[in-house]
Amino acid sequence: MQRSKTYRAAAESFDKDELYAPLAAIKIAKTSSKKKFDETVDVVMRLGVDPRKADQMVRGTVNLPHGTGKTARVLVFANADKAEAAREAGADVVGGDELIDKVAGGWLDFDAVVATPDMMGKVGRLGRVLGPRGLMPNPKTGTVTPDVAKAVSDIKGGKIEFRVDRHANLHFIIGKASFGEVQLAENYAAALEEVLRLKPASSKGRYIKKITVSTTMGPGIQVDPNRTRNVALEDENAQP
């Protein structure tokens, strides 16, 4: 793949084979962000699990302490008082049967989906539309719940969802390049703690095999998964 001059210069500014402390990797990623837009800071983790086995599927959510820097558009499938509660909590789109039909027809102008338990019998038919996009509501991630107001507030406040893919990789964001180094580091630490907590009992050997952090258009910097998770304390000179 042909890389831009900016990308090549950024890739040459650090040792691609070195395993950096999380905060050091974040600093490099921020420095490599030269685009005119506010790039997202992404993390990819390669896990020592077999996603083909149900008991090794790693999936969860975490509330990032400093949010994501993005305003998520939240859709809620609910009726009556639950629908009103969702609207009051800031849901962007709320509805029942008609909204289900609209989504089934291909409308996908939203970033997250929440549903009340009584709606799931009907929402279930959207599996082929929402599932491949990681948008299908699920009790395990708190998106199938009677407390739709809390679910909406959590998502709007910076809650992210992650799920291991068929190659055993986890992808998630920890904020924007405009965030301070410590903000990004603390978001990273929160996500890492949750991934570690979700380690399957049947997973043998090394659980986290590789971690990289990068901006949207920047090169990946390898992070040492064994370094301290209290990343904000790694460098007293870090920018908050």
Swiss-Prot record:
PROSITE patterns recorded: RIBOSOMAL_L1
Highest taxon, organism lineage: Bacteria
Protein name: Large ribosomal subunit protein uL1
Keyword Protease set for record: no
Alphabetical list of InterPro entries matching this protein: Ribosom_uL1_bac-type (IPR005878), Ribosomal_uL1 (IPR002143), Ribosomal_uL1-like (IPR023674), Ribosomal_uL1/biogenesis (IPR028364), Ribosomal_uL1_3-a/b-sand (IPR016095), Ribosomal_uL1_CS (IPR023673)
HAMAP family (alphabetical): Ribosomal_uL1_B (MF_01318_B)
Species this chain originates from: Nocardioides sp. (strain ATCC BAA-499 / JS614)
Protein family: Belongs to the universal ribosomal protein uL1 family.
Subunit-level organization: Part of the 50S ribosomal subunit.
GO molecular function annotations of the record: rRNA binding; structural constituent of ribosome; tRNA binding
Any Pfam family the entry gives: Ribosomal_L1
Coiled coil: none
Record's function text: Binds directly to 23S rRNA. The L1 stalk is quite mobile in the ribosome, and is involved in E site tRNA release. Protein L1 is also a translational repressor protein, it controls the translation of the L11 operon by binding to its mRNA.
Gene Ontology CC annotation, any one: large ribosomal subunit
Keyword Ribonucleoprotein assigned: yes
Keywords: Repressor, Ribonucleoprotein, Ribosomal protein, RNA-binding, rRNA-binding, Translation regulation, tRNA-binding
